[in-house]
Swiss-Prot record:
The keyword Hydrolase belongs to this UniProt entry's keyword annotation: yes
Signal peptide: none
Name the record gives this protein: Retron Ec78 putative HNH endonuclease
Protein keywords: Antiviral defense, Endonuclease, Hydrolase, Nuclease
Entries under Gene3D superfamilies matching the protein: 1.10.30.50
């Protein structure tokens, strides 16, 4: 999960009113360009590539019908709720498998920086960031649980594979720490971070680079 900058609302949302219109009436293809502009071709929650996708209501429309067409409540999530076979993570899992939760206890990536709450390990797992207590710790724990960010075996394996693929380069760069001036070494690190800007599981890769010394 990465921090997102929400842009202006798609105009089509202004044509629909909660209580008068149903979500399935809207042409969702007119909403997707703005979602893609905000989050790229990746899931807003797990950062996998959106090969299967749906528009997710952060606060579910069944419980919060007034938010059905509210732009700030919409994200692009992996999984296609129209296809059989279920989906064991992110938006579909949140509202069909996670059990009871309070949306206020979840990280909302367009309002908060997930880096303040979550740390991805080189094993592919994600854990609460070091030093969290109280409400911040609960948010991290509930976000991991409700979106099932560690419990989906396919997701965990894909994330681990992506991280392990860069670890030789990570380890090599860190082996050069004593050979370069700090500014020069940091510039090399920035170059590596730029290379992953458009990669799947970008945050996990970024944490492998930036937190390597503690969690390799």
């Amino acid at each position: 999960m990465k921090e997102l900058a929400r842009l202006e609302s798609p105009e089509i949302l202004d044509q629909y009113t909660a209580g008068q219109n149903d979500w399935m009436e809207i042409d969702q293809s007119a909403v997707w360009p703005k979602l893609t502009e905000m989050q790229g071709e990746f899931c807003a929650y797990c950062e996998c590539r959106l090969n299967r996708r749906h528009i997710e209501h952060f606060r579910p429309r069944g419980k919060f019908p007034a938010l059905t067409f509210i732009w700030s409540n919409l994200f692009g999530s992996c999984g296609d709720s129209k296809k059989s076979g279920g989906w064991s993570r992110c938006g579909i899992y949140k509202d069909n498998g996670a059990g009871a939760y309070n949306a206020d206890d979840l990280i909302k990536p367009d309002e908060e920086n997930p880096d303040d709450y979550l740390l991805f390990l080189t094993t592919g797992e994600v854990v609460p960031a070091i030093g969290l207590t109280g409400r911040a710790l609960k948010k991290a724990q509930e976000t991991i649980r409700v979106f099932n960010l560690n419990g989906d075996i396919k997701l965990l394996g894909s994330r681990r594979t992506a991280v392990q693929a860069i670890m030789p380069n990570v380890e090599y760069l860190y082996s050069l720490l004593e050979e370069f001036e700090e500014d020069d070494w940091n510039e090399m690190l920035r170059d590596e971070l730029e290379k992953i800007e458009s990669d799947e599981f970008k945050t996990a890769l970024k944490h492998a680079w930036t937190s390597n010394q503690e969690f390799a």
